[in-house]
C-alpha cells in the first residue's frame, strides 16, 4: 500500500504542471482534430474511454478508503530506502503545524482538481464524439459518391482504350498512306527530273536548229546573190548569142543552094522510114499501154512507170492519192486458179518471185499513196482507185475461205500474212504459174495488158457485144485521138469492173435451177466503203460496164447492179456488219485496203428481215447462183448466226465469222421493179449502186428473183411480181393461197417482201391471211416495213393488218422500219396509231432502234409525229410532209410541238441497262443525242448494268454536248476603268471589251472556274497581240514586232461576278453554277491595274501599246526628268504623257510625297514670260534663297510644235540640265525685277510634239532633253492599229474572232493597209509633215454586213483630215525655194497653176494607190463611193508622161537635205530612185513609144490608156508649166510612184489580182524597175512552162531595164520578163494584191547591192 502510494507520489506532485501542459496540448490537438484519420480517431476514443474508466475506479476507491488513503498519503511515502525522506519526516514531526508548511499539496484538493479536470475532459470528449459521428456520416456519403465515380471512371477508361485502338489503326493507315505518297512524290520528282532533262535536251536541239537555220538563211542569201549575178551573166551571154544568131542568119543565103539536095535526102529518108515502123511501133505501143493503164493520164513513160511501182515519189496531197488496182487475167482453163480467188490469187503462189510479190502487195495495200496526175481537161478521173463512180477496189476485202479453211488475215504493208492451214498469200496479184506474160513487168500491168488484148468482143451482161477499142499499133497519130482515149479509159474501167467479180466457174445453164454449191469453194463476198454525200462527177465517159455475173434464176434476167451503199456520216449500218464510218473521210494512208468491221459497238441486234440490207455496204452478187444475204460478223452483241430471222439461209448453221471482212452465206432476192411512187428512189439496189436513173427501168423491170426452195408457182409469181400469172393461179380452184414453205413464207409474205403492190392487192382481194407469220413470227407487214415498201405497208394497213404484231423476238413493224431507216413506213405506221412503246425480248424499243441507226428523221418522227385528226386521209401526205420539216430548220416540229413520247419511253433501258441516250452517246450520234436531250424528261444520270452513265460511255463530241446541256454562258469583259483625262486623245479608246463567253456547268468547281478565267484572259491577250488572221507581210516593215503586249493574269486588279467581288482561287460555299444563278450575274468583269495602283496594265490594254515600252517610258521620265515625246500627228503623244503622269503621281503619293500635275497647252502666242510664270507658280523654279519643298511637280507642255522650241526654251536649257543651287540662272519678271532661280530636283518636265522630225534651229534643243520618237513604221505605232482593230472586231463578235474570209476582216484589213500605204507614199514624197499616226483610224467602224459604212467613214476622213494635210504639205514643199522671202503663206494663199496641178495629181495618186486600192467592195459598188473622195478625178496621164527638160544634174535630191524624213533603219524606204540618172526628153519619148509598140498583146483597155497617155504628151509644156526645180523633182517623184512596180497599179485597181502589168510609162523609172527585177527570186523552168503565148511575146519584146541610161537610150535589147511575170503571179496568190512593196523592204541586203549598181550607173552621166 505504501509502495503504491509512494510510486504515485511523484505524479501527483507534478499534476499542476501536467495539467497546464495537457491543456496546451489539448488545445493543439483540438485544433488538429479535423485532420485526424479514421484509425487515429478510433484510437483516441479508446484511450479516452480507458482513462475515464480508470479515474472512475480511482474515485470510488478513494471514497471508500479515505482514511487509508490519507495515511498512505501522509506517511506512505516514507521508507528506509531514502534518507532524505526520513529527514523530511523528522522535520515535519519536530515542528508545530502552524510553523511548518506541508511538503506536498493536500490530496483532497488534488482530487477535486482532477475531478474537475475530468469533467471538462468528458464534456470535450462528448462534443468530439458527436463531431466524429457527423463526420462518419459524411464519410459514408462520400464513399458512395466515390464508388459511383469509380464506376464512371472504369467506363471512361474502357471507352478511352477503344478510342486508342481506333486511333492506332488510323495512325497506321495514315503512316502507310504517307509512305505511299512519299514514294509517289519521289517517283514524280524523278519523272520531273527526267522531263526537265528532256526539256533541256530539246532546248539544246532547238538552239542548234536555230543556229542551223540562221546558217541556212545566210547561205540562202549568198546563193540568191550568186543567182542574181548569174542571171546578169546570162543576160550578157544571151545578147552575145543573139549577135551570133545574126551572123548565122547571114549564111542562110548560102544554105538555100543546098535545099534541093536536102529535099532529095528527105525523100530517101521517108521511103526508108516506111519499113521501120513495123519494128519500132510495137515497142512504142507497149510503152503507151504502160502509161495509159498505170496512171490513166498522158504523162511521160518514165514518170508513169515510176508512179506504178515506186513508192518514193509520194505526193503530199493525200486527197489525190488513189489506189491503183489492176486484175491479173488467169490463164484459160488453168486448174490452179481457185474458185475463191479474188484478183487472181494463185494457189501456187510459192512459184512467184518474192521481189515482185512484195512489191505488188505493198503497192496494192498502200496504193492510196501513189500520186495521180489528172489532166487539165478532167476535174476528177479516178480510174486507178475507188471513187463514187468507179468500180470498187478489189483489194478492199479479203475473200472468204471455205468452212474447212482458216480465214486469211488482212494484209498490211510490210507484214506477210501467216496462216498455218491455208496456203500463204504473198500478194493479191501474184502471177499465175502458166500465165504467159512478160516476166519483167508488174503483175497488175500484165493483167491490164491482158484485158486490153483479150476479151475485146466478149458479150457483156446485157447480151450486147462491145466493140474493142482501136489498137495502139494502128497509127502513131492515134495517140491524139480523143475517141481512142475515151475507149481506152472505158476498157480500163471494164477491166476493173470484171476484176471485182471474177468467174469462179462456168455459168450455169439458163434453164437449170440455181444450186448452192457449184464449185468446191463458196463464192466471193466483198465489201467496199463508199464516200457519202459526194455527187456524181461526169467524167465525159459512159458509165462503167457492170461486172459479168452468171444467171441467178431459171430464166435469163437483166443483171442486178451491185449493192453499192452510201454510208451516212451521221449513222452506222445496222445489217450486222458495222462499218466504221469514220474511215470514209480519213486520209487514204491511214485506211487499210479492206473494210474495217467495228468490234466496239456492243449493241444487241434482233433478227430483222434482211432483204436487202440497209444501205451500208457493197454486196457483189456471186456467180453460180450461190446464196449471199445474211451477214456474219464478229461484232459483240450482234445477232447470233443461229438466231431465226427473215430470209435465214438453210446452209448457215455455223456461219463463218471473219474478223475484218464480211461473209455472206445466204441467198439474196433482188428487188424487182417496185411500185414506189415516181420521183422516189425505186429500190435500195438502184439508189445504192450509183447507176443513173435512165438505167433503172432496164435493170429492175420484171426480173425473176431466186426462189430458194419455193415449190409452188403461186409463190414464184408473187415473189417475181408476175401479176398475169398470179391472177390466173388465183382463179384456179383448190389452190391454197395461204400455203407456206418450210420457212413459213406465204405468197402474200413474198409479194410484200419484194414490194409488188399489185400482187399484194390481188392476194388481199382473194382473202389471203393478212397476219400469217413465218416460223420466226414475221408477218407480211413486218417484211414490207423492214424493206421500206411503203405502198405495200399502206395497203396492208388499209386491209386491217395487225400493226402492233410482235415477232418471236418482239420486233414490231414499227421497230423494223426504224431499224432499217424507212421514214415513210414509220410515218404510215404512226398515223395508223401503232404503239411506240412495244419492247423486244432484248428490251429494245423503236426509239432504241432509231437511235442505233443514227437516223435523225426517224427519231424526230417517233418523238414528235402526232396521230392526225379524223378525216385526214393518206392522200394528204404530201401536203403534210411539206409542213413537217425534218431537217431541223426553223420550222422543225421540236421547235413548235412538245414531244409525244413519255419520259418513261425515253429513259427505258434494254437488257444491258442502256437507254437510247447511252446508244447515241457511245456511237457519237450527236444529232440524235441532242434531240433526246431536248426532251424534258431525259435522265442523263441513269446508269446501266455496269454502273455507267451516258457521259461515261459518250464520245468526246457527245461529252461536250452533255456537259453543256445546262451550262450558263456568262460573258467575260475586261474593263480599264475610266480613262483620264478625256481630252487627251482617248475618245476612241474603249473602257470595256467583251472577250469571250464562259460556259459554267453544274459540275464546274471554283478551281476549274479560276483556271477558265485565267486561260480566257491569256488566250485573249495572245490573240490580240499575235498576227492572227491578218496577212500584212506586203505592207509591214521588216523589223519584227514582239508578239506579246506584256499582259497576263498578273495584270488583274479585281474581278466582279455580277456585283460580287471575287479573286482568282477564291471559293464560295455554292458552286459557280448555283452562285451565278442565285446572284443573277449577267457578266463577269475583270478590272486591270491602272495608274491609280502605280501600274500601266490598263493603259496598255486601252491603247494597245506594249507594257514593256510603257514601263520603259516611265523609267526614262523618272531617270532623266526631262522627256519629250514626238511623232506624226495622231500618235497618241498626249494620251501617253498624261497616263505616265498619273502613274508617276500615284507612285510618289504611295511613297509618302505630295504630288501635283500641271498642264499647259502651247500655242503660237505662248511666250517665254508665260512659261517662266508657270514654272515659278508651280514651284518648279525656286529662288536661291528659298529652301526646296518636298512636293513633287509634274509639268506637261502640250503641242510644242506650235511654237519655236529654240525661242521658248532657250533660257531654261542650262538650269534644266543642272538642277542645283550651284548653277543658278537669273530671270527677269514682268515687273522688271530680276532674281536668281534654280530648278527643283523633284520637278518632272514632259512635252509633246506632233511632228515627225525636228528642223532648223529646233535641233539646238535636242541635246538637252531625252527624246522618245513615235515612228509610224516602228513599234509601238506600227502594230498599235492592227492590235486595236483586232480587239475591236473581237469585241463586236462577242469574243469570237471571225475567219479571215469574213467581210469584216477584209474591210478592217483594208483600213489598216490604207494607213500603212498612205504613210509609205507620203514618206516617199518627202512630206513627213503630212504623216499620220494611228489615232485617226482608231474610230474605224466595225459593222458586220455593212462594209459601206467603213468606206463612207474613210471618205469623210480623207476629205476632212488626209486631203487637207497632203495639200498643205505638197504646197509647202513646192514653194520652199520659190518664195524664200515671203515664206510659205503667200504660196499657200495663191498657188500657181502648176502647183495646183501637182496637188491634184498627188491627191489622185494617193487616193488610187493608197486608199481605194485593196478595197474589198465590188468594183461597181466602189465606183459609187469614189465620187465622195476629194481629188479623185485628176487625169494621171499628165504626171505619168511629164519630164523636166531644164533640170540640172545633181539636184535631184536637194530638197531632201533640208526636209529630213524619219531616220531609216537598215535601208527602209531608202529607194534607189532618188538618185536615178536624168533622162533626156528624147529618151523618154522614144521609150514611151517603143513601150507602146511592144505592148500590143495586152488588153484593149490598157491600149486605150496608153493611147491617151501618148496623146497627152503632145501638149505637155502647155499643161504643166512648173517654175522651180523642186516642183519638177516632185513631179518626177509622183511620176516614178505612178509607174513603179513596187506600188499598186492605179489603172487596174479592181483587176489588180489578175493583171499586174503597168502603164506604158513603166520604163520611166529604169533604176527602180531594175531593182524590182533583181529582187525577184529565180524561177525554175517548171514554173515558166505555164506561161501563155502573149506573155512569152512580151518576155521577148520588153526592154532591158538594166541597160537603160543616157548613153544607151535607144537600145531595144529585150530583157526576159519571165521573172517579173512569175513574181507577179506569185504575188497574186498572196493576200498582198498587187502591192509588192514588201519585196523592197524585206530584202535589205539586195537593195544595198542595187544601190551600188545605181552608183555605177550614175558615173557615166557625170
Curated annotation (Swiss-Prot):
UniProt-recorded name of the protein: Cortactin-binding protein 2
Subcellular location: Cytoplasm, Cell cortex; Cell projection, Dendritic spine
Residues the record lists as Phosphoserine modifications: 1524
Bias kind Low complexity: ranges: 386-396, 1624-1638
Compositionally skewed regions (Polar residues) per UniProt: 411-422, 583-597, 1582-1599, 1639-1648
Coiled coil: 119-276
Bias-annotated ranges (Basic and acidic residues): 1649-1662
Role noted for this protein: Regulates the dendritic spine distribution of CTTN/cortactin in hippocampal neurons, and thus controls dendritic spinogenesis and dendritic spine maintenance. Associates with the striatin-interacting phosphatase and kinase (STRIPAK) core complex to regulate dendritic spine distribution of the STRIPAK complex in hippocampal neurons.
Subunit structure: Interacts with CTTN/cortactin SH3 domain. Interacts with STRN, STRN4/zinedin and MOB4/phocein; this interactions mediate the association with the STRIPAK core complex and may regulate dendritic spine distribution of the STRIPAK complex in hippocampal neurons. Activation of glutamate receptors weakens the interaction with STRN and STRN4.
Any one GO CC term of the record: actin cytoskeleton
GO MF annotation: an example: protein phosphatase 2A binding
Lineage: Eukaryota, Metazoa, Chordata, Craniata, Vertebrata
Region (Disordered): 1-23, 203-222, 361-440, 454-479, 498-618, 1450-1474, 1580-1602, 1618-1662
UniProt keywords, alphabetically: ANK repeat, Cell projection, Coiled coil, Cytoplasm, Methylation, Phosphoprotein, Repeat, Synapse
Repeat region (ANK), residues: 709-739, 743-772, 776-805, 809-838, 842-871, 912-942
Xref: Gene3D superfamilies: Ankyrin repeat-containing domain
One Pfam family, short name: CortBP2
Top-level lineage group: Eukaryota
UniProt-listed InterPro entries: Ankyrin_rpt, Ankyrin_rpt-contain_sf, Cortactin-Actin_Reg, Cortactin-binding_p2_N
Gene name for this UniProt entry: CTTNBP2
Residues with PTM Asymmetric dimethylarginine: 498
Amino acid at each position: 500500500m505504501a509502495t503504491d502510494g509512494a510510486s504515485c507520489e511523484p505524479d501527483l506532485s507534478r499534476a499542476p504542471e501536467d495539467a497546464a501542459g495537457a491543456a496546451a496540448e489539448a488545445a493543439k490537438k483540438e485544433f488538429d482534430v479535423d485532420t485526424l484519420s479514421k484509425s487515429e480517431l478510433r484510437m483516441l476514443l479508446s484511450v479516452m474511454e480507458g482513462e475515464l474508466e480508470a479515474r472512475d475506479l480511482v474515485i470510488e476507491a478513494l471514497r471508500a478508503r479515505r482514511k487509508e488513503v490519507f495515511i498512505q498519503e501522509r506517511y506512505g511515502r516514507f521508507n528506509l530506502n531514502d534518507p532524505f525522506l526520513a529527514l523530511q519526516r523528522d522535520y515535519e514531526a519536530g515542528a508545530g503545524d502552524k510553523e511548518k508548511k506541508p511538503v506536498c499539496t493536500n490530496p483532497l484538493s488534488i482530487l477535486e482538481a482532477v475531478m474537475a479536470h475530468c469533467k471538462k475532459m468528458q464534456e470535450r470528449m462528448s462534443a468530439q464524439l458527436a463531431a466524429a459521428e457527423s463526420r462518419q456520416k459524411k464519410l459514408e456519403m462520400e464513399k458512395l459518391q466515390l464508388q459511383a465515380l469509380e464506376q464512371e471512371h472504369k467506363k471512361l477508361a474502357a471507352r478511352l482504350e477503344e478510342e486508342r485502338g481506333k486511333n492506332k489503326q488510323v495512325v497506321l493507315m495514315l503512316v502507310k498512306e504517307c509512305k505511299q505518297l512519299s514514294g509517289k512524290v519521289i517517283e514524280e520528282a524523278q519523272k520531273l527530273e527526267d522531263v526537265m532533262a528532256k526539256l533541256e535536251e530539246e532546248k539544246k536541239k532547238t538552239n542548234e536548229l536555230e543556229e542551223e537555220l540562221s546558217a541556212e538563211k545566210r547561205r540562202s542569201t549568198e546563193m540568191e546573190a550568186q543567182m542574181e549575178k548569174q542571171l546578169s551573166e546570162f543576160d550578157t551571154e544571151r545578147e552575145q548569142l543573139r549577135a551570133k544568131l545574126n551572123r548565122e542568119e547571114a549564111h542562110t543565103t548560102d544554105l538555100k543552094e543546098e535545099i534541093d539536095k536536102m529535099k532529095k535526102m528527105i525523100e530517101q529518108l521517108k521511103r526508108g522510114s516506111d519499113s521501120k515502123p513495123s519494128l519500132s511501133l510495137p515497142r512504142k505501143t507497149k510503152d503507151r499501154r504502160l502509161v495509159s493503164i498505170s496512171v490513166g493520164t498522158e504523162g511521160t513513160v518514165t514518170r508513169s512507170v515510176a508512179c506504178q511501182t515506186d513508192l518514193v515519189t509520194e505526193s503530199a496531197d493525200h486527197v489525190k492519192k488513189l489506189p491503183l488496182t489492176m486484175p491479173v487475167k488467169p490463164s484459160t482453163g488453168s486448174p490452179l486458179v481457185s474458185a475463191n480467188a479474188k484478183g487472181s490469187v494463185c494457189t501456187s503462189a510459192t512459184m512467184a518471185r518474192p521481189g515482185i510479190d512484195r512489191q505488188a502487195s505493198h503497192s496494192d495495200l498502200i496504193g492510196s499513196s501513189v500520186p495521180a496526175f489528172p489532166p487539165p481537161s478532167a476535174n476528177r478521173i479516178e480510174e486507178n482507185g475507188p471513187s463514187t463512180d468507179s468500180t470498187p477496189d478489189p483489194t478492199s476485202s479479203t475473200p472468204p475461205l471455205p468452212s474447212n479453211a482458216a480465214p486469211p488475215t488482212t494484209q498490211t504493208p510490210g507484214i506477210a500474212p501467216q496462216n498455218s492451214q491455208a496456203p500463204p498469200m504473198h500478194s493479191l496479184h501474184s502471177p499465175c504459174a502458166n500465165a504467159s506474160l512478160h516476166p519483167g513487168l508488174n503483175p497488175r500491168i500484165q493483167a491490164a495488158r491482158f484485158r486490153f488484148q483479150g476479151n475485146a468482143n466478149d458479150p457483156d451482161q446485157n447480151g450486147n457485144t462491145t466493140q474493142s477499142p482501136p489498137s495502139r499499133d494502128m497509127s502513131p497519130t492515134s495517140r491524139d485521138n480523143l475517141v481512142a482515149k475515151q475507149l481506152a479509159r472505158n476498157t480500163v474501167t471494164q477491166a476493173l469492173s470484171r476484176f471485182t467479180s471474177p468467174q469462179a466457174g462456168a455459168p450455169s445453164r439458163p434453164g437449170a435451177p440455181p444450186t448452192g454449191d457449184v464449185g468446191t469453194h463458196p463464192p466471193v463476198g466483198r465489201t467496199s466503203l463508199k464516200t457519202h454525200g459526194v455527187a456524181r462527177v461526169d467524167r465525159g465517159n459512159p458509165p462503167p460496164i457492170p461486172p459479168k455475173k452468171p444467171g441467178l434464176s431459171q430464166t435469163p434476167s437483166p443483171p442486178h447492179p451491185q449493192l453499192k451503199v452510201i454510208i451516212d456520216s451521221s449513222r452506222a449500218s445496222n445489217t450486222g456488219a458495222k462499218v466504221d464510218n469514220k474511215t470514209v473521210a480519213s486520209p487514204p494512208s491511214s485506211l487499210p485496203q479492206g473494210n474495217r468491221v467495228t468490234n466496239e459497238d456492243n449493241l444487241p441486234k434482233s433478227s430483222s428481215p434482211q432483204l436487202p440490207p440497209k444501205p451500208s455496204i457493197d454486196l457483189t452478187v456471186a456467180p453460180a447462183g450461190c446464196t449471199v444475204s445474211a451477214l456474219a460478223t464478229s461484232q459483240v452483241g450482234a445477232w447470233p448466226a443461229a438466231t431465226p430471222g427473215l430470209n435465214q439461209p438453210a446452209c448457215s448453221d455455223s456461219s463463218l465469222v471473219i474478223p475484218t471482212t464480211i461473209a455472206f452465206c445466204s441467198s439474196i432476192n433482188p428487188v424487182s421493179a417496185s411500185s414506189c411512187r415516181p420521183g422516189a428512189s425505186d429500190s435500195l439496189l438502184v439508189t445504192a449502186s450509183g447507176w443513173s436513173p435512165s438505167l433503172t427501168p432496164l435493170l429492175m423491170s420484171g426480173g425473176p428473183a431466186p426462189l430458194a426452195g419455193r415449190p409452188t408457182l403461186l409463190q414464184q409469181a408473187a415473189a417475181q411480181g408476175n401479176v398475169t400469172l398470179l391472177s390466173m393461179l388465183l382463179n384456179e380452184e383448190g389452190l391454197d393461197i395461204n400455203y407456206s414453205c418450210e420457212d413459213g413464207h406465204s405468197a402474200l409474205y413474198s409479194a410484200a417482201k419484194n414490194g409488188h403492190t399489185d400482187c399484194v392487192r390481188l392476194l388481199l382481194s382473194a382473202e389471203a391471211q393478212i397476219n400469217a407469220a413465218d416460223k420466226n413470227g414475221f408477218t407480211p407487214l413486218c417484211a414490207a416495213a423492214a424493206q421500206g415498201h411503203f405502198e405495200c405497208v399502206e395497203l396492208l394497213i388499209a386491209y386491217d393488218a395487225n400493226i402492233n404484231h410482235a415477232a418471236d423476238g418482239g420486233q414490231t413493224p414499227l421497230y423494223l422500219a426504224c431499224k432499217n431507216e424507212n421514214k415513210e413506213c414509220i410515218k404510215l405506221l404512226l398515223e395508223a396509231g401503232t404503239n411506240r412503246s412495244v419492247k423486244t425480248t432484248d428490251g429494245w424499243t423503236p426509239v432504241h432502234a432509231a437511235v442505233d441507226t443514227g437516223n435523225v428523221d426517224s427519231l424526230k418522227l417517233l418523238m414528235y409525229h402526232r396521230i392526225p385528226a379524223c378525216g385526214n386521209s393518206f392522200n394528204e401526205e404530201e401536203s403534210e410532209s411539206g409542213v413537217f420539216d425534218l431537217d431541223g430548220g426553223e420550222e422543225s416540229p421540236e421547235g413548235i410541238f412538245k414531244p409525244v413520247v413519255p419520259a418513261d419511253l425515253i429513259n427505258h433501258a434494254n437488257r444491258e441497262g442502256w437507254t437510247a441516250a447511252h446508244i447515241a452517246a457511245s456511237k457519237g450520234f450527236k444529232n440524235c443525242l441532242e434531240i433526246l436531250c431536248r426532251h424534258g424528261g431525259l435522265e442523263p444520270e441513269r446508269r446501266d448494268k455496269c454502273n455507267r452513265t451516258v457521259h461515261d460511255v459518250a464520245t468526246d463530241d457527245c461529252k461536250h454536248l452533255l456537259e453543256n446541256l445546262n451550262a450558263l454562258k456568262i460573258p467575260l469583259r475586261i474593263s480599264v476603268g475610266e480613262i483620264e483625262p478625256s481630252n487627251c486623245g482617248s475618245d476612241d479608246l474603249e473602257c470595256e471589251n467583251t472577250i469571250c463567253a464562259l460556259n459554267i456547268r453544274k459540275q464546274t468547281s471554283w478551281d476549274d472556274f479560276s483556271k477558265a478565267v485565267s486561260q480566257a484572259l491569256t488566250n485573249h491577250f495572245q490573240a490580240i497581240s499575235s498576227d492572227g488572221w491578218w496577212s500584212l507581210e506586203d505592207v509591214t516593215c521588216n523589223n519584227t514586232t514582239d508578239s506579246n503586249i506584256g499582259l497576263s493574269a498578273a495584270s488583274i486588279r479585281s474581278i466582279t461576278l455580277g456585283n460580287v467581288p471575287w479573286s482568282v482561287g477564291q471559293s464560295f460555299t455554292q458552286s459557280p453554277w448555283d452562285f451565278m444563278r442565285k446572284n443573277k450575274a449577267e457578266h463577269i468583269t475583270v478590272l486591270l491595274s491602272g495608274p491609280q495602283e502605280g501600274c500601266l496594265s490598263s493603259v496598255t490594254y486601252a491603247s494597245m501599246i506594249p507594257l514593256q515600252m510603257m514601263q520603259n517610258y516611265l523609267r526614262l521620265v523618272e531617270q532623266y526628268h526631262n522627256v519629250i515625246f514626238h511623232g506624226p500627228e495622231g500618235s497618241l503623244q498626249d494620251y501617253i504623257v498624261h497616263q505616265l503622269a498619273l502613274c508617276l503621281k500615284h507612285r510618289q503619293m504611295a511613297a509618302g510625297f505630295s504630288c501635283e500635275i500641271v498642264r499647259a497647252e502651247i500655242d503660237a502666242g505662248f511666250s517665254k514670260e508665260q512659261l517662266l510664270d508657270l514654272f515659278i507658280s508651280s514651284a518648279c523654279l525656286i529662288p536661291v534663297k528659298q529652301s526646296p519643298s518636298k512636293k513633287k511637280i509634274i509639268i506637261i507642255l502640250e503641242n510644242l510644235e506650235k511654237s519655236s522650241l529654240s525661242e521658248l526654251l532657250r533660257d531654261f536649257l542650262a538650269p534644266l540640265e543642272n538642277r542645283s543651287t550651284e548653277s543658278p540662272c537669273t530671270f527677269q519678271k514682268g515687273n522688271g525685277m530680276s532674281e536668281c532661280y534654280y530648278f527643283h530636283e523633284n520637278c518632272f518636265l514632259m512635252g509633246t510634239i506632233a511632228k515627225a522630225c525636228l528642223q532648223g534651229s529646233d535641233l539646238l534643243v535636242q541635246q538637252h532633253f531625252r527624246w522618245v520618237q513615235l515612228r509610224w513604221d516602228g513599234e509601238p505605232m506600227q502594230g498599235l492599229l492592227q492590235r486595236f482593230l483586232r480587239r475591236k472586231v473581237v469585241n463586236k463578235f462577242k469574243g469570237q474572232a471571225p475567219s479571215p474570209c469574213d467581210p469584216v476582216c477584209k474591210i478592217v484589213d483594208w483600213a489598216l493597209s490604207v494607213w500603212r500605204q498612205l504613210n509609205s507614199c507620203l514618206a516617199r514624197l518627202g512630206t513627213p509633215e503630212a504623216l499620220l499616226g494611228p489615232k485617226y483610224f482608231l474610230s474605224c467602224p466595225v459593222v458586220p454586213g455593212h462594209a459601206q459604212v467603213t468606206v463612207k467613214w474613210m471618205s469623210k476622213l480623207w476629205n476632212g483630215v488626209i486631203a487637207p494635210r497632203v495639200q498643205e504639205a505638197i504646197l509647202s514643199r513646192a514653194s520652199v525655194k520659190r518664195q524664200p522671202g515671203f515664206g510659205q503663206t503667200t504660196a499657200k494663199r495663191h498657188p500657181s497653176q502648176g502647183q495646183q496641178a501637182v496637188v491634184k495629181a498627188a491627191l489622185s495618186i494617193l487616193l488610187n494607190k493608197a486608199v481605194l486600192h485593196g478595197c474589198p467592195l465590188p468594183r461597181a459598188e466602189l465606183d459609187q463611193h469614189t465620187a465622195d473622195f476629194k481629188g479623185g478625178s485628176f487625169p494621171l496621164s499628165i504626171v505619168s508622161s511629164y519630164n523636166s527638160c531644164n533640170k540640172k544634174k545633181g539636184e535631184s535630191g536637194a530638197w531632201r537635205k533640208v526636209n529630213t524624213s524619219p531616220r531609216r533603219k537598215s535601208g527602209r524606204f531608202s529607194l534607189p530612185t532618188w538618185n536615178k540618172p536624168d533622162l533626156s526628153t528624147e529618151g523618154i519619148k522614144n521609150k514611151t513609144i517603143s513601150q507602146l509598140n511592144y505592148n500590143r498583146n495586152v488588153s484593149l483597155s490598157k491600149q486605150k490608156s496608153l493611147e491617151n497617155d501618148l496623146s497627152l504628151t503632145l501638149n505637155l509644156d502647155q499643161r504643166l508649166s512648173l517654175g522651180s526645180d523642186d516642183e519638177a523633182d516632185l513631179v518626177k517623184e509622183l511620176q516614178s510612184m505612178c509607174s513603179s512596180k513596187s506600188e499598186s497599179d492605179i489603172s487596174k485597181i479592181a483587176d489588180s489580182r489578175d493583171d499586174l502589168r503597168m502603164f506604158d510609162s513603166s520604163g520611166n523609172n529604169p533604176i527602180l524597175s531594175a531593182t524590182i527585177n533583181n529582187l525577184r527570186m529565180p524561177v525554175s523552168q517548171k514554173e515558166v512552162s505555164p506561161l501563155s503565148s502573149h506573155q512569152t511575146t512580151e518576155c521577148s519584146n520588153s526592154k532591158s531595164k538594166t541597160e537603160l541610161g543616157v548613153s544607151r537610150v535607144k537600145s531595144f535589147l529585150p530583157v526576159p520578163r519571165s521573172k517579173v511575170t512569175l513574181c507577179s503571179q506569185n504575188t497574186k496568190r498572196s493576200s498582198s494584191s498587187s502591192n509588192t512593196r514588201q519585196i523592197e523592204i524585206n530584202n535589205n541586203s539586195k537593195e544595198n547591192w542595187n544601190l551600188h549598181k545605181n552608183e555605177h550607173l550614175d558615173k557615166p552621166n557625170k
